[in-house]
UniProtKB/Swiss-Prot annotation:
HAMAP family: AroQ (MF_00169). This is Catabolic 3-dehydroquinase. The keyword Lyase applies. The lineage of its organism: Eukaryota, Fungi, Dikarya, Ascomycota, Pezizomycotina. The active site is at Y23 (proton acceptor), H100 (proton donor). Substrate binds at N74, H80, D87, I101, S102, R111.
């Protein structure tokens, strides 16, 4: 059974509360529940982790080595600043999909740069919490088709 790690960065624990006009009304718990349910439907194990601390995110990535087949990451504010998280992802050689709830390209100019996009299998932006579902569906159809049918 394939395993996907859903990794969420800083302030995503405030989903549903923080700027709902930008990030929507779904909570992190709602997003994680949806990911677990979708995983069950497709015979995929889903693990979730959120932290506001860069080192904890890096430790989680390191611990995923040889245990996880795909990482779906919303690096949040670290998108534009964390070479360390990028290096951790590249160091463990786990493919990853970058997800952003808002359309970062339609926001402040400094949000346009990502340290992850050039190495990601795919980048999903601006679809709200549905972006996580799209990432899992992409994995089902393109990465794990024989393992999930």
């Amino acid at each position: 059974m394939p395993t996907i790690l859903i990794l969420n960065g800083p302030n995503l624990n405030l989903l549903g509360l923080r700027e709902p006009h930008i990030y929507g009304e779904s909570t992190l718990e709602d997003v994680e529940k949806m990911c677990h349910e979708l995983g069950k439907q497709h015979n995929i194990s889903v693990k979730t982790f959120q932290s506001n601390h860069e080192g904890q995110l890096i430790d989680c990535i390191h611990e995923a080595r040889n245990k996880v087949d795909l990482i779906v990451i919303n690096p949040a504010g670290y998108t534009h600043t964390s070479i360390a998280i990028r290096d951790a992802l590249l160091g463990v050689s786990i493919p990853f999909i970058e997800v952003h709830i808002s359309n970062v390209h339609a926001r402040e100019k400094w949000r346009n740069h990502s340290y992850f996009s050039d190495k990601a299998l795919a980048c999903i932006v601006g679809l709200g919490a549905f972006g996580y579902e799209v990432a899992i569906q992409h994995a089902v159809r393109n990465l794990f088709p024989k393992l999930t049918s």
